């Protein structure tokens, strides 16, 4: 037992002369000091009273008496350590913290022994119980209000959460009982008072076998201290201490303690700070608990605690406390005479023989019914008027009479349906007072076509509906309708069979006035074929169609539009009728027979889902049709504009860029006119056409050496015809959006067209060519060969001016040669040199390009009337007028072209622009082109070297 031997005590005096023989006479006869009155409380550890005649002639040993003193001393000190360690951090009060603190292991509880507490308990540690027992150990825990500032107040909270000023309550109690000035201790709020006491047994001497009794006393004390250790952490003061430790509360809320010796002075007139009530309450202010008594040879050892039952304290602002006091006074003075809202809810929920149903009034709606639709007011509550338009409609129908504010007895209960996987359902019960009737409202949603997901079923009963939630039968009054969220698709709703005609036109038999026909109870899986209900107005369907309640894709009402939550009036004699409640329950069971048929509901669900999916797909593709058409037009326009900007940038700076010829695509094959019936209309040049051009380049290389010899001075007749003309390129037509009249595309099985139809002017009604041709469209002759050809052909050009202008086209002329002339536009300078409007513009293309354009058309075509031919512009820039005339004569002789007009060309020229070398332009056309002409002096001789360099570069790349 960790007891150290002590020297034997001196012989005890006779019992008659012991100073403790008359201890019972010195103590007052009070229940607090007499442990015998506590026999029914605590642990009940005590023994029977020994007979008064039992005496011991022998004295106990000195060592046994020392062990008894040690047991009593540790009983007091360990009780104080257990009590204070659970409420106060004693380690902070220790001035000299130790690395290896001393542990107190008495009574099988290990706690750190604090030196500061040892000093405060020194009087109980040095006392000798054999001579004089120690006084009672009093430990008080309290709150000190000295740390509060002037604008802070310590408040106590009652069971309802009301605040009361603690100092004010203590001051009133002190002034009522005090005869003198109030001491400073009135600022303390005592929370607990612990009492550890050694009670004296009268006429009791120490037994001779004291050493054998002490172990039994120690074991009994272990049980007491275990109980103390546990119960001390269940009292309200311990909870306050833990809450302050977590929240780092105000210093005024920190629990303090003080240790007193003896009992309070009974003559003190001041009231006890522990038992003073801080606020009015029906509960006890304090309670007392005794941990039992342990009998010892020197008396009864006992531990008792008196504690406050309410320790809810906090520090608040004084002004806020004063304001709350005024508000509390207003609540008491201006208390309404009508019953409260909570009492009405309890009365409405109370029912006999049914499950509890949660109901809410119109003034107290369910927050879960808040719906963020544009057609609602974004409010929480029953949608009596779902939109401003419906509110005006309802006001117009109800008349000019203003309704009176509803009283507490006429509130309309609102059924709140619990949330479910299918969504929240807002249910309006048609229960009202006898004098109040609710009119149906018609809503006009702002959108004509609601989304597909906003197509709920109208007749599914609420998921949490009680059998007695409604008063009317379902065929007569659709009392509740689902209000699913907008994300709920129509396919998630189950459909029911269509009702009979008698059910849809049913009226109430116990109502004096006819009621409007309710909304259809059943919903078909084909929601777009469901008929619109009537609400007593023959123009209801027309109004709904004009207001946007129906659409091409879905005729279901939009959530929040008010149609799902329309309420109809009820009569006074149908409220809270038990027989009608039973009837309603039976009707509901009859209507929901499909719950037992899972296959039918599953098939209906699949059908509804399939119908909705089909409708959604059709709607999506219908909307995509217009957008795709617009996208196609936009892409075509952008490609045409891009090619126009690209080709116009390659032209000369003096030519206007917005020429119709600059947007021609070169994807079409030669000899095939562009027709609006072309099956393929790519806006991007095709690589197939480019490949065909490259393939024909091989033939072009074989034909090139004979190009010089073809032009002889004897005449324009060409002796031989290239064999590659019979091969046609792959036809990849261009975009149909070109600014020329449509041409019919010839069939591939038809015979070859006449030479006139294969002319390039038929395909491209433009007579000019861009300056910047690609590398594959240029010839590869050297500059000396070009000059030699120019000299040979210029010698014969002066002798044929008249015959050049009037010679008709030869029937045997090579169409490829004629097409080559159209590949190059006439020079504006030559056009100005001709006198008279009847003179046709002569082709000015160089013969160098003839083999190339006899095969296929190049990518550099820009048939605008203001484009210049690269061949003519590169040789005739800056030349005098006689040289230009010689070039003009030479080109006519070489290409075999003349200014005559054939019969076929006359017919075709009526609907298109004039072609170079074929048709005589009208005077208006010549006059139109006059402001756009430019002088040849704008182009210097340096341009010729630039073209020569480009010829060389392109030749090397090929």
Swiss-Prot record:
Biased composition (Polar residues): 50-59, 547-559, 833-848, 894-903
Region described as Disordered: 1-62, 337-417, 430-576, 644-762, 790-958
One Pfam family it belongs to: ATG13
Bias type Pro residues, positions: 736-756
Compartments (UniProt record): Cytoplasm; Preautophagosomal structure
GO cellular component labels: Atg1/ULK1 kinase complex; cytosol; phagophore assembly site
Origin species: Aspergillus niger (strain ATCC MYA-4892 / CBS 513.88 / FGSC A1513)
Family: Belongs to the ATG13 family. Fungi subfamily.
Ranges annotated as biased composition (Basic and acidic residues): 357-367, 883-892
Ranges in a coiled coil: none
Biological role: Activates the atg1 kinase in a nutritional condition dependent manner through the TOR pathway, leading to autophagy. Also involved in cytoplasm to vacuole transport (Cvt) and more specifically in Cvt vesicle formation. Seems to play a role in the switching machinery regulating the conversion between the Cvt pathway and autophagy. Finally, atg13 is also required for glycogen storage during stationary phase.
One annotated GO biological process: protein transport
Low complexity bias (residue ranges): 397-411, 501-514, 644-653, 864-881
Keywords: Autophagy, Cytoplasm, Protein transport, Transport
The protein's name in its UniProt record: Autophagy-related protein 13
Summary of subunit composition and partner proteins: Interacts with atg1 to form the atg1-atg13 kinase complex.
Gene: atg13
């Amino acid at each position: 037992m960790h007891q150290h031997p002590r020297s034997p005590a001196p012989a005890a005096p006779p019992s008659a002369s012991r100073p403790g023989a008359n201890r019972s006479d010195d103590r007052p006869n009070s229940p607090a000091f007499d442990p015998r009155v506590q026999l029914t409380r605590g642990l009940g550890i005590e023994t029977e009273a020994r007979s008064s005649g039992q005496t011991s002639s022998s004295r106990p040993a000195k060592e046994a008496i020392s062990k008894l003193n040690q047991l009593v001393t540790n009983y007091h000190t360990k009780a104080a350590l257990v009590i204070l360690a659970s409420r106060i951090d004693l380690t902070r009060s220790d001035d000299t913290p130790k690395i290896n603190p001393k542990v107190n292991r008495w009574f099988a509880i290990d706690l750190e022994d604090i030196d500061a507490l040892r000093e405060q308990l020194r009087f109980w540690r040095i006392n000798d119980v054999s001579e004089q027992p120690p006084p009672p150990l009093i430990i008080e825990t309290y709150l000190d209000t000295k740390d509060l500032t002037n604008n802070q107040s310590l408040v106590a909270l009652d069971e309802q959460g009301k605040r009361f000023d603690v100092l004010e309550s203590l001051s009133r109690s002190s002034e009522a009982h005090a005869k003198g000035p109030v001491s400073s201790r009135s600022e303390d709020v005592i929370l607990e008072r612990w009492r550890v006491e050694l009670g004296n047994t009268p006429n009791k001497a120490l037994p001779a076998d004291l050493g054998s009794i002490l172990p039994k006393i120690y074991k009994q004390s272990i049980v007491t201290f275990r109980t103390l250790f546990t119960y001390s952490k269940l009292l309200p003061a311990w909870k306050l201490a833990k809450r302050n430790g977590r929240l780092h509360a105000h210093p005024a809320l920190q629990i303090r303690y003080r240790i007193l010796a003896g009992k309070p002075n009974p003559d003190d007139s001041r009231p006890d700070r522990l038992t003073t009530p801080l606020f009015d309450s029906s509960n006890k202010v304090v309670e007392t608990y005794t941990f039992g008594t342990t009998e010892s040879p020197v008396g009864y050892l006992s531990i008792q605690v008196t504690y406050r039952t309410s320790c809810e304290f906090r520090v608040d602002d004084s002004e806020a406390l004063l304001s709350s006091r005024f508000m509390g006074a207003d609540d008491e003075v201006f208390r309404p005479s009508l019953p409260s809202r909570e009492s009405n809810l309890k009365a409405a929920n109370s029912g006999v023989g049914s499950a509890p149903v949660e109901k809410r009034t119109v003034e107290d709606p369910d927050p879960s019914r808040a719906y963020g639709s544009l057609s609602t007011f974004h409010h929480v509550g029953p949608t009596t008027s779902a939109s401003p338009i419906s509110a005006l409609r309802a006001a117009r129908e109800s008349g000019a009479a203003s309704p009176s504010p509803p009283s507490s007895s006429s509130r309309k209960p609102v059924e709140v349906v619990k949330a479910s996987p299918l969504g929240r359902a807002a249910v309006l019960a048609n229960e009202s007072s006898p004098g109040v009737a609710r009119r149906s409202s018609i809503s006009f949603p702002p959108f004509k076509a609601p989304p597909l997901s906003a197509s709920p079923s109208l007749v599914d009963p609420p998921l949490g509906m009680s059998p007695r939630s409604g008063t009317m039968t379902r065929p007569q009054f659709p009392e509740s309708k689902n209000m699913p969220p907008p994300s709920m698709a129509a396919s998630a709703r189950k459909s029911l069979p269509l009702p009979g005609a008698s059910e849809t036109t049913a009226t109430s038999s116990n109502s004096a006035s006819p009621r409007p026909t309710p909304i259809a109870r059943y919903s078909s899986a084909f929601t777009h074929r469901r008929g619109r209900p009537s609400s007593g107005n023959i123009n209801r369907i027309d109004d709904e169609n004009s207001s946007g309640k129906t659409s091409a894709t879905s005729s279901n009402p939009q959530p929040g539009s008010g149609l799902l939550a329309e309420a109809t009036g009820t009569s006074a004699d149908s409220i809270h009728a038990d027989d009608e409640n039973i009837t309603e329950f039976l009707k509901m069971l009859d209507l929901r027979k499909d719950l037992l048929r899972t296959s039918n509901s599953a098939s209906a669900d699949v059908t509804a889902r399939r119908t909705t999916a089909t409708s959604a797909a059709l709607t999506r593709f219908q909307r995509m049709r217009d957008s795709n058409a617009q996208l196609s037009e936009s892409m075509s326009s952008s490609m045409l504009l891009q090619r126009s900007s690209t080709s116009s940038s390659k032209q000369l700076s003096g030519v206007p860029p917005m020429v119709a010829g600059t947007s021609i695509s070169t994807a079409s094959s030669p000899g095939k006119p562009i027709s609006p019936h072309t099956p393929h209309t790519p806006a991007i040049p095709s690589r197939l056409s480019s490949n065909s051009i490259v393939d024909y380049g091989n033939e072009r290389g074989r034909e090139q050496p004979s190009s010089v010899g073809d032009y002889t001075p004897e005449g324009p007749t060409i002796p031989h015809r290239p064999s590659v003309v019979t091969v046609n390129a792959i036809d990849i037509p261009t975009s149909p959006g070109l600014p020329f009249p449509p041409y019919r595309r010839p069939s591939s099985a038809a015979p070859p067209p006449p030479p006139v139809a294969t002319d390039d002017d038929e395909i491209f009604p433009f007579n000019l060519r861009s300056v910047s041709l690609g590398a594959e469209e240029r010839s590869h002759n050297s500059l000396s060969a070009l000059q030699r050809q120019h000299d040979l052909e210029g010698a014969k050009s002066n002798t044929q001016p008249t015959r050049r202008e009037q010679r008709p086209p030869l029937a045997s002329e090579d169409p490829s040669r004629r097409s080559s002339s159209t590949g190059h536009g006439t020079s504006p300078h030559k056009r100005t040199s001709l006198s008279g409007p009847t003179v046709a513009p002569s082709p000015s293309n160089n013969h160098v390009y003839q083999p190339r354009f006899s095969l296929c058309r190049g990518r550099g075509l820009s048939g605008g009337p203001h484009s210049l031919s690269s061949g003519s512009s590169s040789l005739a820039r800056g030349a005098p007028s006689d040289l230009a005339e010689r070039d003009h004569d030479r080109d006519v002789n070489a290409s075999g072209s003349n200014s005559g007009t054939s019969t076929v060309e006359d017919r075709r020229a009526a609907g298109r622009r004039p072609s170079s070398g074929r048709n005589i332009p009208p005077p208006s056309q010549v006059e139109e082109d006059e402001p756009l002409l430019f002088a040849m002096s704008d182009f210097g001789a340096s341009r010729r070297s630039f073209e020569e360099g480009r010829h060389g570069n392109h030749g090397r790349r090929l």
